[in-house]
């Protein structure tokens, strides 16, 4: 229904600026020195899932806008910027991390709502198929389901679905 071109960059920003030290501790506890880079990335997402799960919905009032490189959908605004709102003295890193995930999910809801306004001839689906790296986390899937108020179904091999689609387009193009 749309794309948020910086959702993975938002998570990368969290990793680099909010959680790098904690992720190192987590990897020492659960990781292995021989893990591949891909496995380390999965472990990083496991860490993020672990720390945001106990934070209540709404991130204790913290709101994040996920536009680290402008906004492209549903409205184009190259000057839009990512921001945190409602930061108070009692807000910790985990609330900020969950707010990033919620901000991404609320943006997905915004795109879906705009798409549904444009396509009135189709019945509103009660199910949304989720792909990409975020679909690997149960907590992230539940946050998306709660925000969309729909069932979320994770596609098979969600982190690779873009490459599969590109390969299918190439195959069709080549005959």
Briefly describe each language-model feature range.
Residues 1-73:
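A short helix-loop
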Residues 51-164:
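Activation-segment/catalytic-loop signature of the eukaryotic protein kinase fold
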Residues 167-170:
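Short low-complexity, flexible loop/linker segments enriched in glycine and/or proline
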Residues 172-175:
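Cytochrome P450 heme-binding "Cys pocket" and the immediately downstream C-terminal segment
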């Amino acid at each position: 229904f749309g794309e948020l071109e910086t959702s993975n960059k938002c998570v990368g920003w969290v990793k680099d600026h909010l959680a790098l030290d904690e992720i190192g501790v987590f990897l020492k506890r659960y990781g292995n020195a021989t893990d591949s880079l891909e496995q380390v990335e999965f472990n990083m997402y496991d860490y993020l899932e672990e720390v945001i799960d106990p934070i209540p919905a709404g991130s204790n009032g913290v709101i994040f806008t996920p536009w680290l490189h402008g906004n492209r959908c549903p409205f184009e605004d190259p000057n839009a910027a990512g921001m945190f709102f409602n930061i108070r003295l009692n807000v910790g890193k985990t609330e900020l991390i969950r707010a990033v995930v919620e901000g991404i999910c609320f943006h997905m809801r915004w795109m879906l709502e705009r798409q549904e306004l444009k396509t009135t001839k189709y019945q509103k689906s009660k199910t949304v198929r989720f792909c990409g790296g975020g679909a690997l986390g149960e907590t992230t899937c539940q946050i998306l389901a709660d925000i969309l108020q729909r069932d979320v179904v994770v596609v098979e091999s969600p982190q690779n679905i873009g490459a599969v689609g590109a390969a299918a387009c190439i195959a069709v193009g080549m005959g």
